[in-house]
Amino acid sequence: MTEAGGNGRWPPAGDGARLGFKSHLRATVVPGEAAYLVSQRGVTALYGDHSEVLVPLLDGTRSPDGVLRDAAPALTAEEAAASLRALDAAGLLRLRPAAPESPTAPPCPDPAAEAYWDLAGLDGVHTLDRLARTSVRPVALTDVDLDEVGAACRASGLTLAPPDTEADLSLVLCDDYLSPRLREVDAGHRAAGTPWLLVALGTATPWIGPVFRPGEGPCWHCLATRLRGHRHSERPLQRALGLDGPPRRPHATLAAGRAIAVQLAVLEAAKWLAGVRSSSHGSVNTLDTLGLRTTAHPVARLPQCAVCGDPGLVARRVDGPFVPVSRPKAVHDLNGHRALTPSQMWERYGSLVDPVTGIVKEIRRAPGSPEFVSAFLSGRNLAMRSGTLAGLRAGLRSLSGGKGLTDEEARTSALGEAVERYSGTRQGDEPVIHDSLRALGEAAIHPNSCQLFDDRQLRDRERWNAGGSRLHHVPPPFDTRRPTDWTPVWSLTGRTRRLLPTSMMYFGEEEAPDGLSADSNGNAAGSSPEDALVQGFLELVERDAVALWWYNRTRQPGVDLDAFGEPYIERLREGYRTVRREVWALDLTSDFGIPVIAALSRRTDKPAEDIVFGFGAHFDPRLALRRALTEMGQLLPLVGGVTPEGGGYRVTDPEPLDWWRHSTAANRPYLRADRDAPARGPRDWPYSPTGDLLEDVTTITELTRSHGMELLALDQSRPDLGLPVVKVIVPGLRPFWPRFAPGRLYNTPVELGRCAEPTPYDRLNPIPLFV
């Protein structure tokens, strides 16, 4: 019951043992040509006279000495032994125990099973014996015939564990991997140290795996965390019905499908107990019984898992200071100033895209995208999700996405936004301080320093909120005496810790008790923490500049697209011309001096102009323009199929629909360039490239300080993802939604010479920005 030469001697001692080929091989000799070994994996040819002599003798009826003896006189003992050693070294031979003395004793119980384990790289005879000495216990959490499962186990050589004994492996059968009963199953197996294989039946796509190993690899809670992320739509119903788990789904399967799933589960159990370790044991393996396709979905361990990991990882990261370090730029072109290229980013983080175990189900090209636009979608926008049934219905249109000049760039951008939104969602392990603003003193920042709602908006909040838009929702006045949760953020300008309401820092499913809510303003994923910090800051500057222009309706200088001399610009313009659109751009640069550009486009062939726009900010004006143009392309699929009769919009939100149907360049003159101001080209912005992201961090820190503001950062990176995510906050900078408190919105346009005096509150643009 061993490899023939496993003891290093030749011929091996055997006490009557018989030498022959392994069970998965069938030998055939073609005289004068070769001896052939046929298996499920192909044919092996053995050439030479030695093979023609020895192969017929290796039929398992002779001892090693008998093979040497019968090979003579054609081969000397030394020649035969040398050839046998070569065959043994190739893993082709097996030494079997002597045949049973009783003529009624059964032969090998299952020659095909023995051959299967041989093909797996094991000793088939030894493996069958090992399986007979180990045990498995089926555990049913669903309506399944355990006798049928037990019969399948026995048919594959597995031994069922007797009652009240420990099994070597549990086979847990359920109908949903998020069944609340699995918490108890997981806890019991961790306490006993017993591995268990999870299987879901009762569906057209059965799930098999992984094998959970207490103390090693991911646990059920790691997997459940990822699975819940794909089932947000069930949570409002679960909450409304008071369920402790997801709503039960009706079974949808045939008897044949159930039998296949059971047999595959038993196969995985047998492989595990036999000692085979493959990637399938660490994956959720799905079988599409309609299309007969199997897919492996690797399960990742969450380092911060509260059950099998270190639940304090996130808290320690957030509590500590944000200390930027040197990050040389690997990319310094129109792709951006990054530490990694888009292809490197995708190679490193692309595994996060998986419909079962990833954080985003898929990344796909945006429906309706014209060929000249690279726009991709990456699933639900977690910043817009809701914990109510009504919110769910309203939020089904909200998707995260990505942009770029190429599909690779846009796909990577979409992944980055998905990670950004996921990382910015509250998961329960974030550090908080529960107290009131008054009790916390100077470290705490009043939320309206960031939200910037005017007192009149707060008083008139019912009218503002009547439209139901989450982006334009006005909260109740903040109660400074009421305790709430606060999150530590790091001040790069003050080099100290500050506090902001947690409900403003992380997305949540339910309305927070303090009435506040988070938005994505200043959230960014990057190739490094420094990269994410810089990108988040640039977004704040961009949106502040957009707000100054939009709500004051100032006329801004145009941007001379030809002056940039970029071939991609002409390609885009030609593409827009093919869909009967005009393209232009405006300079929105504010007192921060960082180039901010708005790109706009309108239909030229019908009264409703379906005006779309995009914005971009960067130290390099070429990159600012590129970002504005590619962001504008993300809106184009929503209006690309509009008919002259006014149908074909891909959204139902009233605000963008009203804009597209009624706003034109003529009745919204602030959308057009100021004819009295010269158009801007790339040389009109002072720009000196830097080679290290740390230099950019220093620049934005000092720039913020010079404006009398504070640069705050919250590291939202998740240990299980690895992609850095930072939320950047600069109290006083405007988001581009309608936030009308006193400050920059009124004063800065006057300081820049755009307005002779501050625009009165009641004369601000009544059309809210809807992106």
Spans of features found by a protein language model:
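Long, low-complexity, charged/polar intrinsically disordered regions in eukaryotic proteins
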Residues: M1-G42
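Long, charge-rich, low-complexity alpha-helical segments
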Residues: E3, E33, S39-L160, L198, ...
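Short amphipathic alpha-helical segments and helix-helix/interface helices
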Residues: L84, G150, L182-R190, R573, ...
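Structural alpha-beta junctions
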Residues: A151-P162, R190-L197, T578-E582, E702-E710
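E1/E1-like adenylate-forming module used to activate ubiquitin-like modifiers
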Residues: S156-T159, E166-A261, K271-V276, D288-G320
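A structural signal for well-ordered alpha-helical segments within the folded catalytic domains
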Residues: A259-L267, E530
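Short glycine/serine- and small hydrophobic-enriched flexible loop segments
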Residues: L264-W272, G416
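Helix-biased "structured C-terminal domain" signature
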Residues: V284, G291-V771
